[in-house]
Amino acid sequence: MPDLLIELFSEEIPARMQARARGDLKKLVTDGLVEAGLTYKSAGAFSTPRRLALAIEGLTAQSPTTREERKGPRTDAPEAALEGFLRSTGLTREQLEARDDKKGQVWFAVVTKPGRPAAEIVAEVLERAIRDFPWPKSMRWGSGSLRWVRPLHSIICLLSDESGASVVPLEIEGIGAGNTTRGHRFMAPDEIAVSGFEDYAAKLRRARVMLDAAEREAAIRQEAANLAFARGWEIVPDEGLLSEVAGLVEWPVPLMGAIEDRFLALPPEVLQTSMKEHQKFFSARNPKTGRIEGFVTVANIETPDHGETILKGNQRVLAARLSDAAFFWENDLREAKAGMADWAEGLRSVTFQSKLGSQADRIARIAALALEIAPLVGADADQAEQAARIAKLDLRSAMVGEFPELQGIMGRYYALEAGLPEPVADAARDHYSPLGPSDAVPSAPVSVAVALADKLDTLTGFWAIDEKPTGSKDPFALRRAALGVIRLLLVNGVRANLGQTFAKARPDADAADLLAFFHDRLKVHLRDQGVRHDIIDAVLSMPGNDDLVLLVNRATALSDVLKTEDGTNLLQGLKRAGNILAQAEEMDGVEYSFGADPKFAETDEERTLFAALDKAEPAIREAVRLEDFQAATQGIASLRAPIDAFFEAVQINSDNQILRRNRLNLLSRIRDAGRLIADFGRIEG
């Protein structure tokens, strides 16, 4: 069984596109091979800035022979029908078989297709993959029609086995497949002939090309850590930057430098962001001081001076960049110390959304809402309002203009320079959080108040102008904002009536529709934590469903009890009681909720169930009143055994109508006991 090696060698592939391109190449080729009848043992895709490669082991040498039977017209059908059938099968009349059918004799065509050699199939599949490759952006070059991310120079397409290797005959736009590639652009630019994947990977390594992106990442991570350790520093983790840099180099050579003393007073976030965004440097931190004092740059070449010239050049560019940052910082500090009034005035001319006014209008709404929310989260109301009014002023600062990702972070520095209390400054930094499902959730009361007000103003505002998420489209990130509100409420245990809060934020918003949207997002959030959607539906029908903390406490307690054997059996009993009642009420035209009388109990099982309900109902009610849903669910679970025994021993639909009605009313008590906690009829199972 041969192995297949493919390499597509081109000019530099953007780093951000490489991971997806590896997956696309593997899928396009392997799916095409399997569809054509070939199988394989394993496949792996690789990338460097100048190449995409695919190695497939254990490919079958040819596709299997196939035999297809096709039913045609009756033997006495008109000649035109027979001729059409012959054209569709490519056979002659003599090659058809007449067979008996329930409608008479019918022509059958048996079409045998011999297997095709792997090389023929590979050539077709690879050409189609190259022409249909889904690059996010592509280009044409020269006079050809082929599109690729950057000009494509050469193709390796090689089948190899124990007897040797052969090039698959293939040519695309004048580029013929071969068995040669090139090494590192500067250190080993000559052609390299290869005979298979192992030979290919080994020769590339000797030619200063590290083929595996994961290996390049590991090499950068380890060497950067070693360089930092030698100076008593540590590398600030940044997996996104690591992945990007690994896609920029074929032979990573990390080099470490120090930041000039005159820049060390800049906030560490400014240093880190400037170095990352402008130069793709990793930041090195002094663990004793917390300051960013050094950097690691990753060269793509080994030099006789061990990178000294490269490092000096990078330090010159870095000094220029940090000089700009220092200029922004100094100017911003002067404005902050003056009270930031000019920034506040400037936001009047910045439109937030055409129907929702300026950023200044938005800030006024957030401040008013933060004042309302403050008591719910235990925040100082004056500080919450003050924090809301200054939290977005850094949007007008020069630093945030240069580095938008520093919004909020710089706001804290400027608030402190303005002499504002630390809780107010912290809220300026934290009010955008959480930005995603894994982002940290603020816990300081003032920060929580402003973060909630910010997100709720956004949500109620867009609901008021009917700009809601639709399908996969969510241009204003409203789903993320709703998840942020949910996490802020749940993590901090904030007891808020969302319906009332929506009305205070924006009376013209459709509060019921927005609450339904929150419930949908809550289902997604809890599903990730192992709570089923039907359990959420069951508790949503209960009073207080706009208090998310209350709702989640109910749902998690119910989810826990339903995972037990008692809970599973109890659910069956409650659902059975509900189903029997629903059928009887529909048939009799009455609602059985008149109260069952124990004096009509004929069996021990009935009397036991009466006693169990008499004991459980008040305990469940009290537990629900105290919001102790663990105790409430344990109370309902205590009914499992008497309910099971009742259904086992008692005939509900007795011929004696007095007994029948009493037993149905007893079932009503069971249903009502369950409804103290949830609508069990909505739970699957």
Curated annotation (Swiss-Prot):
It catalyses: tRNA(Gly) + glycine + ATP = glycyl-tRNA(Gly) + AMP + diphosphate. Residues 66-77 have a biased composition (Basic and acidic residues). It holds the Pfam family tRNA_synt_2f. It is found in: Cytoplasm. PROSITE patterns: AA_TRNA_LIGASE_II_GLYAB. GO terms for biological process: arginyl-tRNA aminoacylation; glycyl-tRNA aminoacylation. Disulfide bonds: none annotated. InterPro entries: DALR_anticod-bd, Gly-tRNA-synth_bsu, Gly-tRNA-synth_heterodimer. One of its GO terms (cellular component) is cytosol. Keywords: Aminoacyl-tRNA synthetase, ATP-binding, Cytoplasm, Ligase, Nucleotide-binding, Protein biosynthesis. Its EC number is 6.1.1.14. Residues 58-77 are annotated as: Disordered. GO terms for molecular function: arginine-tRNA ligase activity; ATP binding; glycine-tRNA ligase activity. Belongs to the class-II aminoacyl-tRNA synthetase family. Tetramer of two alpha and two beta subunits. This is Glycine--tRNA ligase beta subunit.
